Amino acid sequence: METITVGLDERSYPIFFNVNELSMLGSLCADQKLGQRVAVVTNPTVGAWYFEPVRESLVSAGFSVHKIEVPDGEEYKNSDTLKDIYDWLIDFGLDRGSFIVALGGGVIGDMAGYAAATYLRGIPFVQVPTTLLAQVDSSVGGKTGINHEKGKNLIGAFYQPRLVMIDVAVLDTLAEREYLSGLAEMAKYGVVLDAEFFRFMYDNVEKLLSRDKECLLAAVKRSCALKASVVEQDEREGGLRAVLNYGHTIGHAVETLTGYRQYLHGEAVAIGMAQAAKISESMGFSSSDDTERVLSLLSKLKLPQDLPPFSPSEYIEAICHDKKVRDGGLNFVFNKNLGSFTIATVADVSQLLRICGIGE
């Protein structure tokens, strides 16, 4: 089993990478001395596949296991579902000597993590991500929270897990669209942080699309290592960590405007990345060849690139409700060529939209 550590002093934690080793979860949790009672938060789809092996592993390690099943989908990442989780935690009698396991994708991880951060002023939690997007992004770094009708992730907290267990074999049961969505977040790291990793993805598209285990394990581990290096330097998004929002400013606007129902998160990010690449070129940060490479990779990964047809005013309203807006200015992430980035404050959002063909 391969391991990397997210180094955050007393909040440091390991990320374990493996293939077909969910049975190890119980012993890994026992090593962390998290307490004896655990609530596993999952959804019906993931639970049908993986709750039993997770439960058996935890029980065999001496834990008392409770199951919390919540609806599947981004539209349920809200205060109503969060209240249901609190109700179950209270009904089960979980105390500060208990912990939560988030078994699922990004929605489950975000909500279960936020419940852990706030229940009894904080109990430990463990991430067991079952989607590619969650494995390479949301399970690492401690961002937890829920959506508000006015925007995505407007309510939340930074709260680090005690460990993350990533088993790439669980991706075999992931729907194709969900899997491709995760490849968008993976590509993001290459575009703004690591040109060599971008080339690795570009050269191994077919292996990635076929879910080749060796290739996947290497790509997921590299993605997590890149994210961990950013989080270690800027845990609470005071500066550097904003690079991880590449493609997300426009992507979140797309999700908000479509009610979180038309696009998966990674699909919206892919649209945002395509537009960010065009904007970066227009602003002089990258070349047309760089933009062509980004758009080509997204195309090879079968990801959307075109903005849905909303008015400039609708896009501006959605973008200006984003948490990346500070003091009236929008902090926007531009790719500098491939493998590097710059962050600049944009006062005129309509200028960005015009570059994207909105409001010409």
Swiss-Prot record:
Pfam family of the protein (one): DHQ_synthase
Catalytic activity: 7-phospho-2-dehydro-3-deoxy-D-arabino-heptonate = 3-dehydroquinate + phosphate
Cross-referenced CDD domains: DHQS (cd08195)
Keyword Metal-binding part of the UniProt annotation: yes
InterPro entries: Dehydroquinate_synthase (IPR050071), DHQ_synth_AroB (IPR016037), DHQ_synth_fam (IPR030963), DHQS/DOIS_N (IPR030960), DHQS_C (IPR056179)
Any one annotated GO CC term: cytoplasm
Compartment annotation: Cytoplasm
Keywords of this entry: Amino-acid biosynthesis, Aromatic amino acid biosynthesis, Cobalt, Cytoplasm, Lyase, Metal-binding, NAD, Nucleotide-binding, Zinc
Pathway(s) it belongs to: Metabolic intermediate biosynthesis; chorismate biosynthesis; chorismate from D-erythrose 4-phosphate and phosphoenolpyruvate: step 2/7
GO MF terms, alphabetically ordered: 3-dehydroquinate synthase activity; metal ion binding; nucleotide binding
Single biological process term from Gene Ontology: amino acid biosynthetic process
Residues binding NAD(+), per UniProt: 72-77, 106-110, 130-131, 143, 152
Membrane-spanning residues: none
Residues at which Zn(2+) binds: E185, H248, H265
Cofactor: Co(2+); Zn(2+); NAD(+)
Family: Belongs to the sugar phosphate cyclases superfamily. Dehydroquinate synthase family.
Reported function: Catalyzes the conversion of 3-deoxy-D-arabino-heptulosonate 7-phosphate (DAHP) to dehydroquinate (DHQ).
Protein name (database record): 3-dehydroquinate synthase
Species this chain originates from: Geotalea uraniireducens (strain Rf4)
